Each structure stands twice: as structure tokens, then as C-alpha cells.
Amino acid sequence: MTREPSELDKVADAWVDKMAELSPSFATYIGRKGSDHLLDDPSPEAIEEHLAESKKFHAKVKAAPVADRVDEVTKAAMLANFELNEELHDSGVWKRDLDVISSPAQGIRDIFDLSPTDSVEAWENLTKRMNSVPEAIDGYIRTLRLGIEAGDTPAKRQVEFNIKMAEGIAAADGFFNKFAESAKAGDSDLPDTLKADIVAAGHAATEGYAKLLEFFKGDMLENANSVDAIGRERYALFSRKFLGAKIDLDETYEWGREELARVTAEQIAVANEIKPGATVAEAIEVLNNDASRKLHSKDELQKWMQRLSDNAIEKLNGTHFDIAEPLRKLECMIAPTNSGVIYYTGPTDDFSRPGRMWWSVPDGVNEFDTWRETTTVYHEGVPGHHLQIAQQVYNRAELNSWRRLASWSSGHGEGWALYAERLMADLGFLDDPGDRLGMLDGQRMRAARVVLDLGVHLGKPKLDGTGTWDFDYALDFMGKNVNMSPEFVNFEVHRYFGWPGQAPSYKIGQRIWEQIRDEYKAKKGADFDIKEFHKTALNLGALGLDTLKFALLG
């Protein structure tokens, strides 16, 4: 049965319309037509305009009547979101918005991965979008200059990393030039005149990043902050942003240390199953030398991901989850970038672009270990991000556009994905000791993130008691707690230093999901059904974790 939209739903829908107008990237992400030729504007003026519109809708949401329980949850979620975003703006952090993964320096390029490329019209739009890159870069530089004027700048380490990133994009064989030169409308060639325009636009976008590179190497590097830590006050804001919940930061740090020790002990026990008496490192060596667990090309990786994903959907549907037909298509993709990141992008509103799992393979890497990555497919796909996000988009019967398309909390989303990994182990999908060790390897990394992130940004003492956390200590600590290449570990630690509060949201989010499930189970007593809990929780959409608790437990 479809719920009749309330007055609050209409306000929420109008806010999504305004968000799509203010952010063409958001419009592209959700499949909203009409702005695929535009780019987000990261200039100070655009940021202030976005804040002003946000405040208008904040007031409208606050004044809107509440018709039912769905409205109660919507109102709680939207008010929390508006209030926090205004606090973050007032803190001034937007003037120093530069990190290695989520800032405009990456976002201006990243949206091209999701832009339609299947028609002449799509490439006409992409030509205009690429030609907009220099203007977007200019606006972004002006925003960062405000931070320089205020003496509030990103850490030097983040600037240095972005110099390397910008060098790659600004090179003659950088992303935009290669993207333009390979342009096709699906399998069809484009008209010569359009092709020439596309190549010229690729050059223009490349020149835009050359200007950003010049700024990074000059004024930005000269004025960069020598201090990596964001500090307790701002960290508390970022923690709330990524969790949608207020937590005791010091208690969570101590819990993180305990959780890291617990997962490590569990790893040691599984290592003994793989080879009696083996250390974790020795068990990993056994797995890495097992030819049956090897993939030898990007093509093999893509096909393996797709098979594993399709099998999970088939086995889970109708047994542990009810997976609607549009959700049963998940495309596993090799990304056009080489950062090493594995990520998920949700479907468009009409599912014309399905949910996609992306693997960004570093240059020179052509061998992959299935024991390590089986759990990753479940994390990004089903029952992880794809089931969660695509179900949210699908639930038109109950949720307004904001709840379906725009509401997101890392603690909810990443916490669910880690919860889903453990669930797959509980359901028998990771009974193979190698695959289970891979899951624990990921869980250990996420627990280590809690300790490192809080330790660095709160200025905690090093675990050995010698001074406070710094980059070299963090790099060594992370290297000892993950079984990944030095290049990957280096990227990850740079990420944590520049994106405070995000990395711990995975494990902390999992913790809160499990706490909510256990409280829900206690409340239901003998009537508790885990399948019903998952369905009820996922049908709510991605809420901040405090709001999720309110929605499920009252």
C-alpha cells in the first residue's frame, strides 16, 4: 500500500529539487535530468547560497505538521541534518576543504565516472561539463584562499598528496585527455566535429587541473598547516556528521583498543585452522601461495566479482532477505582510475543505471587474492551497500525523495556494510577459513582505524607511552594491523589524517547497529525475527544512527 504524501513529505521533496539545482553532481548521481552539462560550484558565493537555501528549508521543516510515525522520523532526521550542517559551516572548516579522497579536488573529476556516455547528447553534455572544469577550479581556489586569509588551512601533508594527484590529472596522458580521446556513444563512433570539441574540452579540463596544481605547489603549500590533528572541538562535529550520533569520544577510543585486541585474537585462532601453530602472517603466506585463490587479470577480477555477487543475491533472496526485482541487478565494474579504492555507487531513481560496485586497480597490479576480497564483495554488494542503498531508493511506497535519495550517514551505511560482513559469516558464506580470515583482516583494519583516528585527532598518547600520536607512528601502527601493500597503507593513513571522523564510522557504526539490534531483540522477546528486523530497518532508509535508534526503539 502506498502512503499518501504529507505536508512534510512535500517540503522534503522540494528540498531534493533544490539540492539537485544547487549540485549538478547530486542530480547526476540520482539520475535527475537537465544538469549533466554542469558542474558543482565550490566557490565561496555558491557555498553561501547553499547555506541560505538550507536555512530556508530548515525553517520549513521545523514548521511542518507531523502526520504519522514516518513523518516523526523524517522530521527528526532532517532537523538533525540541517542543524549539524549549519554548525559545520559556522566552524569554518569549509575554507580548508582539502583531503585525499572526498574534497572538491577529487569531486570535480569523480563525477565524470557517473556521467552518461551512451549517446551523442550525453557527449555534448560532457563537452560542456569538461569546459566547466576551469571555472570550478577557480571557485575552489578562491574558497581555499579564504582559509589562507583566516589562517585556517589544510595540513601540509594533505597538500603534498594532492600535488601528486593533480600532477597525474594535469599530465598530457591524464584522465581528461584520455577520457576525451576514447569518447564513443556506446559502441558507436561520434561525429568528427563533436569529437574535436570533446578533445578540446578535455584539454581545457586538463589545463584547469594544471592551474590547481600551480596553486597547490605555490600559495597553498606555503601556507599549509603544520599540524595534522583537527582538535577535539572540530572532531566532535565531524564524528556527529559521519555517525549521525553523539558518542563519548574517550570511551570509544578505549573500546577501539579492546575491539582491536579481540579481533586480533580471533584472527590468530583462524590462522591455526589454516596451518596448525601458524601466526597470522604465516597463514596469509599459505593463502597467498594457493593458486586456487588467485586471479590473474582485471578481467578475471571483474568476472569473479560478478559471479560471487550474483550468487549471493540468488542465495539470500527469499531466505534471509526479500530482494525486489530491480535490486537483483548489480554491476561489478573496474573503475577508470587507479587509486586502489573499492566503492559502491547507487542506482538512479528509476534504476535505469543500476547499482554498481567499482574496483579502482592501481597501475601495475594484475594479481588478486580471492580469500582477501570475498568479504569485500559482500560489503559493497549484497547484503551490504547495494541492498541497503538500492532498497532505500526503491521504497517509494513509504519514503519521500529526501529519505530515498539524499539521506546518508556513513555510520549507518558503512556500519551496516560491516554488520553485513559478520552476518555473512554467521550464515555460513565465510566458512572457508581463508575467506573468514579475509573478513577478520578487514574487521581488524576497521578497529585499528578507530584507535588511530581518535588517537591522532584528539592528541592521545601513543600506545607505548612515548609522546602523542604522529604520522610516522600511525603509519607503523597501521602497517602492523593490515596485510596490504605499503602504498595502500600510506594512502589510507593520509586519508585518516585529512578526513577526521570518517574512517572510525565503519566500526563504530557496526557497534551501534549491533546495539540497536540487541535492544530491538530484547524489546520483541519471543516475537523477534531477524529477517523482519533487517527488513524494517532497511525500509527506513539511511538515517543518522541516533535517529535510527529513535525509529526502531522509540
Stretch-by-stretch model annotation:
Residues 1-554:
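N-terminal maturation segment of proteins
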